């Protein structure tokens, strides 16, 4: 089976947002599956968001932020750059 290749490059801001979410998860000592459960998301989708492989809706950002105990604005203020 051939590996699928992305038609469009990953958006750097989306990747950065995912890194921030991952950093908050680690800083709070949480597990990805716990955050996914609390946000009522499939764990695989959350992993795609964290890796920047899938864009998310604003409603999904709200759920993730709530499950992390931060605001959506905090996700962008805490956004890490490479």
Annotate each PLM feature.
Residues 29-48:
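Short alpha-helical DNA-recognition segment
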Residues 50, 68, 76-79:
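DNA major-groove recognition helix of helix-turn-helix
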């Amino acid at each position: 089976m051939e590996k699928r290749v992305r038609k469009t490059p990953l958006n750097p801001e989306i990747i950065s947002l995912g890194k921030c979410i991952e950093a908050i998860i680690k800083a709070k000592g949480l597990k990805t599956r716990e955050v996914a459960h609390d946000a009522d998301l499939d764990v695989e989708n959350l992993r795609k968001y964290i890796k920047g492989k899938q864009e998310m809706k604003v409603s999904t950002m709200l759920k993730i932020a709530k499950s992390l105990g931060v605001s959506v604005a905090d996700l962008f203020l805490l956004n890490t750059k490479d």
